[in-house]
A protein has these predicted regions:
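Conserved C-terminal C-lobe helix
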Residues: 113-128
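Conserved catalytic-loop aspartate of Hanks-type protein kinases
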Residues: 77
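Regulatory extensions appended to serine/threonine kinase catalytic cores
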Residues: 154-263
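Terminal C-lobe "cap" of eukaryotic-type protein kinase domains
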Residues: 131-132, 139-154
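Conserved activation segment of eukaryotic-like protein kinases, specifically the C-terminal portion
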Residues: 53-66
Length: 532
């Protein structure tokens, strides 16, 4: 049985003690007995009631630093479990016979460098402030399991998907059409997709209702209600003292965190960001600055075109929930967005290039791990492709796009994106003959019913023509294959194909005469020289 599986068993046992009001107090490797198929906690002599002062037992290096002031608490056991996991998996320095506090530098610790989520997990479990640790053994167990699943998927290449117990699935995708902007904006640049922070905000998952919240039962059943209906229900409940929701009258206007979050979320769905933000600030005062509040703060920041602030919020959520898909997707999306905005600036400040590289590295890391963990997260596949193209790694861009399942509604979009990744976005002289041929081969596999196909044919043929101008010796038709998209792979053949494709597209353009005339003019310009 591996170490992390053993810790899951320990968390289960300690969680049971907590459920009956007891604290184990002395979790450490010496008190864990691992058999072939089970794990046992031994030496129960230090077990005491929660808040039970008196003799405080524990082992330096594993014992929570605040226990003398607070007495035995759930948070103190969480700390000891985190320290135990750290000592068993990474090198912790010893001084005067005890392990020193803290964790080693993640940059110089291979386990952390290879598994950043694991570092975040230990960081939260062993936080100096008990309020920043996992709230329960069950919560920590869920995150340990999620991090373990991600680690196995990344190291084996075999996806390990699972539904989250604290987040909904992703509500929609974002960024799937971005690389097809040259196709969609062929006639009108305004028709091309762009990286919109609001699209990211609306696509991200949202936190599930905490089942321990007093209003959980009613709010869970109403989670998908129309936002106006949600607001009407909450206002009516508030007017009657929340009797219908809580089963008793309360005078407090904020008796439940989840009621307040449902109200803020409803305003966000109605695009009323200012009201939602004001509510979230009020919620922080009444219920504390939990990761759920930070999540919605991040959504507000995205909708207000403040990606830097959103990035900070989502990064805090990731630190609290290191095994969750939602925060990783949010951090990746906002990091890429900031990097794109910085790249588009004409006046680059000193250090901006390094900042862009750092942001893209963060985005690439999370997209990569998300995609390897779950092939249903197609947003991550397209994100990986974009960042690979930005880095000049065109083979790396194709790989995740080819892995998009045929059952996905984005399957044809992924195939089209792979074609564009091979031939567009750089000088034709930098494109290879092999890439042009591969793009054409892939394009022929896309059904003719795909609306973008005719424009993509023009892009591939146009790139081939530009490549021939940059490589004059290639214009004589040497090399295999001898044809491209049904036309001879010579300058004359490619010009003929380009002309024919332009005229076909002109015939299909019936609603905009300017576009039609432009296509005819282009066809006349590129057609091969003839005697008539």
């Amino acid at each position: 049985m591996c170490i992390r599986d053993s810790i899951l068993e320990v968390l289960l046992a300690v969680g049971y003690l907590h459920s009956v009001g007891l604290i184990y107090n002395d979790v450490k490797p010496d008190n864990i007995m691992v058999g072939s198929d089970e794990v046992k906690l031994i030496d129960l002599g230090a077990v005491s009631p929660i808040n039970g002062y008196g003799h405080l037992y524990g082992t330096p290096g594993f014992q929570a630093p605040e226990i003398v002031k607070t007495g035995p608490q759930i948070a103190s056991d969480i700390y000891s479990i985190g320290r135990t996991l750290a000592v068993l998996t990474v090198p912790i320095e010893m001084r005067k016979g005890r392990y020193v506090d803290g964790l080693p530098d993640p940059a110089t610790t291979p386990v952390f460098a290879e598994n950043p989520s694991y570092y975040l997990l230990l960081q939260r479990a062993t936080a100096a402030d008990p309020a920043e640790r996992f709230a329960s053994a069950e919560e920590m167990s869920t995150q340990v399991l999620n991090v373990l699943r991600e680690t196995v998927a990344v190291h084996t290449g075999v996806p390990r998907p699972a539904l989250s117990t604290v987040f909904t699935p992703q509500r929609s995708t974002f960024g799937t059409d971005l690389m097809l902007a040259p196709v969609d904006g062929f006639f009108d640049p305004d028709q091309a997709a762009f990286y919109d922070p609001v699209d990211i905000a609306r696509a991200l998952p949202v936190p599930l209702v905490n089942p321990l919240d007093p209003a959980a039962g009613l709010l869970t059943s109403a989670a998908l209600s129309d936002p106006r209906q949600t607001l009407d229900s909450i206002n009516a409940a508030r007017a009657e003292g929340f009797v219908s929701i809580l089963g008793r009258r309360v005078n407090d206007g904020h008796p439940s965190l989840e009621i307040d979050l449902a109200e803020a979320r409803a305003h966000l769905e109605l695009d009323d960001v200012d009201t939602a933000l004001a509510l979230l600030r009020e919620i922080s005062v009444h219920h504390g600055n939990s990761w759920r509040v930070q999540w919605y703060m991040g959504i507000c920041a995205l909708m207000n075109d403040e990606p830097e602030l959103a990035y900070e919020r989502f990064d805090e959520v990731l630190g609290a929930m290191p095994g969750e898909v939602g925060p990783k997707l949010a951090v990746a999306g906002t990091a890429e967005l900031i990097g794109r905005w910085l790249s588009d600036e004409t006046d680059h400040s000193p250090g901006s290039a390094q900042r862009i590289t750092e942001l893209y590295d963060v985005a690439q890391h999370h997209y990569h791990d998300l995609w390897l963990t779950d092939h249903a997260i197609v947003t991550a596949a397209f994100g990986l492709a974009r960042l690979s193209v930005a880095a000049g790694d065109y083979d790396g861009a194709i790989r995740p796009l080819d892995e998009v399942p045929a059952t996905s509604r984005h399957f044809n979009t992924a195939r089209a994106t792979a074609v564009i990744a091979l031939v567009h976005g750089r000088d034709p002289s930098e494109v290879t003959r092999e890439q042009i041929v591969e793009a054409a081969r892939r394009l022929e596999q896309i059904p003719d019913s795909e609306p973008r196909k005719a424009r993509m044919v023009l892009i591939v043929l146009g790139t081939a023509l530009g490549w021939m101008h940059a490589n004059p010796d290639a214009a004589h038709g040497s090399g295999e294959p001898s044809t491209l998209l049904g036309f001879p792979f010579t300058e004359h053949g490619i010009r003929t194909g380009t002309e024919r494709s332009l005229r076909n597209l002109a015939r299909q353009t019936r609603t905009n005469r300017d576009h039609r005339f432009m296509l005819v003019d282009l066809a006349n310009y590129v057609r091969p020289d003839t005697l008539f």
